[in-house]
């Protein structure tokens, strides 16, 4: 069994361990090393000493994307059976007065300011749609007109009214956690639209966001070692990864087959890296994302909510501390008869004021409240502070945005099993962190399957050749021409095409990886104008005479077909193409197809027993998960068919009926979802 280390016991480390159990089962031993004496990192729910009142000392809330599409974090919260509380508010404090969004701004500052606010929000809605917002960080961001100008420049260009400009700075400061000159216009834009209906919802977990940490901990299978700070990562002479660390007693050294680094960017910067290739790669990685942003928490307990009904929402935005969010914790948590206000100070103010003592910070927070609320000091009972310096990123995802593989695996040649996890790689949210954990564990899964095969099966080394013997005993069942239809059912294929693209007949289809043409012949017998291409000369030579015209010998990297000659492509051969030629092969498939492609290659996230049973990794040169393959398709002229016509449930029903579900090929409906791609034009 292989050994895997997770460095960091924060939410990223726990999410990764949870995903690994889900994806790998018991295929590896997992050890989590956490430098502190607790799990959870910046997900921290606090309790006051003088009363059993709850407040969020770390992550303030969770983003809800479910109104637009699948929301993995929301689904995870539901999986654990956790209850959630929706959060909303519209108030902003300017010039000492609490105002109700645009109507309040209109009343106090006049129509010119209010109209400027509404006009800029409309402009923002045109600059990024709810669907584009939902899709998050990606290569498409690099083409956005606000990507290469600062947020400060955007505000200066788009808003003439100085009060309206100040309004937007205050409203967004606690989200971007930095100054408008330190981030780009696109990142600010994605925060400006959070106040526009239809983009996002916000919620908190009942009884504290740290319930998520407790639930993750309860479902993972790992050896957790607290107070173990990893200092250096390198490699042994035998090729394993070596971690050097200290605990409460002294130094330790441990070796692993695979390593997940689940550290905040600031802590990643403190690590030492053994070996020049790794050191250079990690220095470049750290530098690329070195845009620290800061938070400071000031949480205050009062004897009662003395403000009465003056704070009707879950928070209000305040111009204090350069623009901060003040949460009314009683709107989401049980604070008893008490009142709790919780300041989220951001950016340079958080960095500067973090140098002050707790008493001074609490005093400043009390002074910042609008006088209309009443005498805050008369009701003060207790205050707590929490400093989260460099805990988030001023430009999450980096600029320009890079592909997911590059971000998560900085040195793939000599250190393919060293993978990173971080919210800074996506959008500096818990949602982004879960996405990062999912992506990173997919990479780990692929590497683990490679290592398993390298070690052999039942102590025997396995052949990697696609030779005559391979086809004479195809996947251990017998001659290819006798057993091919146990893996490819022409009726099932035709049914899937009908469900996804609503085409039952009258189309032309290419089978990419057609062997001796049996599938081509079966499809033609059904009235489909099917053609094939196969690069293995031996098996292609067995093509029946009547199919030779339709089953071509050649490579999918350079095909003898016209542009857009086929309506659809069914491919099973991309995984057998060398890594360097995969992208050219996908582009060539894109060239010859008009409508869509069905992906049928072997993937690393197919169930291990299925892979072992049929030795599916034999001859595979490009191994990846369904998700990794989808990224390659996205970057080369394709998009998920389900984005335009989501028929996942119908596909899954058909798959189960055809006996192609769990234990046969498709483990779940998600694997089907990532098997169908539409050809798209650049402007799409």
Placement of each model-derived feature along the sequence:
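Conserved flavin/dinucleotide-binding core of flavoenzymes
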Residues: 2, 15, 23, 47, ...
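Glycine-rich FAD pyrophosphate-binding loop
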Residues: 21-49
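Short, glycine-/aromatic-enriched active-site segment of Class I SAM-dependent methyltransferases
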Residues: 55-58, 597-621
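Mobile amphipathic helical/loop "lid" adjacent to a hydrophobic cofactor/ligand pocket
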Residues: 77-183, 454
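Active-site/ligand-binding neighborhood in enzyme catalytic cores
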Residues: 132-229, 236-241, 255, 267, ...
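Mid-domain catalytic core of redox enzymes
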Residues: 228-345, 352, 372
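Conserved N-terminal segment of class I S-adenosyl-L-methionine
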Residues: 452-558, 586, 670-682
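A short glycine-rich, Lys/Arg-flanked "PGG" loop and its adjoining helix->strand segment in the class I
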Residues: 583-597
């Amino acid at each position: 069994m292989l050994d895997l280390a997770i460095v960091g016991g924060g939410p990223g480390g726990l999410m990764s361990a949870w995903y690994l159990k889900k994806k790998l089962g018991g295929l590896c031993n997992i050890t989590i090393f956490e430098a502190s004496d607790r799990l959870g990192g910046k997900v921290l729910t606090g309790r006051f000493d003088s009363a059993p009142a709850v407040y969020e000392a770390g992550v303030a809330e969770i983003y809800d994307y479910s109104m637009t599409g699948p929301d993995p974090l929301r689904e995870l919260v539901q999986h654990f059976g956790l209850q959630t509380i929706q959060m909303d508010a519209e108030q902003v404090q300017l010039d000492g007065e609490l105002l109700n969004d645009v109507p309040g701004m209109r009343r106090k500052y006049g129509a010119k300011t209010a109209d400027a606010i509404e006009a800029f929000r409309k402009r923002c809605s045109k600059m990024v749609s709810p669907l584009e917002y939902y899709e998050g960080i990606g290569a498409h961001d690099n083409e956005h007109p606000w990507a290469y100008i600062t947020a400060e420049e955007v505000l200066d260009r788009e808003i003439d009214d100085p009060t309206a400009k100040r309004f937007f700075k205050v409203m967004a400061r606690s989200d971007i956690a930095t100054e408008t000159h330190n981030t780009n216009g696109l990142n600010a834009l994605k925060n400006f639209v959070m106040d526009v209906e239809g983009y996002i919802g916000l919620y908190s977990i009942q009884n504290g966001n740290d319930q998520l940490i407790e639930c993750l901990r309860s479902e993972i299978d790992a050896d957790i070692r607290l107070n173990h700070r990893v200092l250096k990562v390198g490699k042994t002479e035998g090729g394993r990864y070596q971690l050097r660390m200290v605990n409460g007693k002294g130094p330790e050294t441990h070796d692993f087959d695979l390593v997940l680094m689940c550290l905040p960017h600031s802590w990643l910067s403190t690590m030492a890296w053994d070996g020049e290739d790794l050191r250079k790669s990690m220095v470049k990685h750290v530098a690329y994302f070195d845009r620290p942003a800061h938070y400071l928490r000031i949480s205050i307990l009062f004897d009662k909510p003395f403000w009465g009904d003056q704070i009707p929402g879950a928070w209000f935005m305040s111009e204090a501390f350069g623009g901060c969010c003040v949460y009314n914790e009683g709107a989401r948590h049980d604070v008893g008869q008490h009142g709790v206000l919780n300041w989220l100070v951001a950016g340079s103010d958080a960095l500067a004021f973090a140098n002050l003592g707790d008493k001074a910070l609490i005093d400043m927070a009390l002074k910042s409240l609008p006088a209309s609320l009443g005498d805050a000091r008369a009701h003060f009972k207790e205050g707590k502070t929490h400093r989260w310096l460099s805990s988030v990123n001023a430009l999450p995802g980096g600029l320009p945005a890079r592909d997911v593989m590059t971000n998560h695996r900085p040195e793939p040649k000599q250190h393919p099993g060293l993978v990173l996890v971080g919210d800074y790689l996506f959008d500096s949210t818990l949602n982004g962190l879960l996405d990062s954990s999912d992506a990173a564990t997919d990479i780990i899964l692929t590497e683990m399957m490679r290592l398993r095969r390298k070690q052999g099966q039942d102590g025997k080394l396995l052949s990697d050749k696609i030779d005559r013997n391979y086809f004479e005993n195809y996947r251990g069942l017998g001659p290819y021409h006798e057993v091919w239809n146990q893996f490819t059912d022409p009726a099932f294929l035709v049914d899937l095409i009908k469900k996804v693209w609503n085409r039952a007949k009258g189309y032309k289809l290419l089978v990419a990886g057609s062997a001796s043409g049996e599938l081509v012949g079966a499809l033609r017998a059904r009235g489909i104008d099917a053609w094939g291409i196969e690069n293995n000369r031996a098996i292609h030579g067995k093509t029946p005479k009547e199919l030779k015209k339709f089953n071509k010998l050649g490579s999918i990297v350079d095909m003898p077909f016209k542009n857009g000659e086929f309506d659809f492509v069914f491919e099973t051969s991309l995984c057998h193409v060398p890594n360097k030629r995969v992208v050219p092969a996908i582009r060539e498939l894109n060239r010859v197809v008009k409508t869509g492609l069905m992906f049928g290659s072997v993937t690393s996230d197919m169930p291990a027993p299925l892979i072992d049973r049929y030795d599916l990794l034999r001859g595979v040169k490009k191994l990846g998960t369904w998700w990794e393959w989808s990224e390659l398709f996205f970057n080369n002229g394709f998009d998920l068919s389900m984005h335009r016509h989501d028929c996942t449930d119908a596909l899954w029903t058909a798959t189960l009926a055809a006996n192609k579900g769990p234990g046969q090929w498709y483990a779940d409906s998600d694997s089907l979802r990532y098997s169908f791609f539409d050809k798209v034009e650049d402007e799409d």
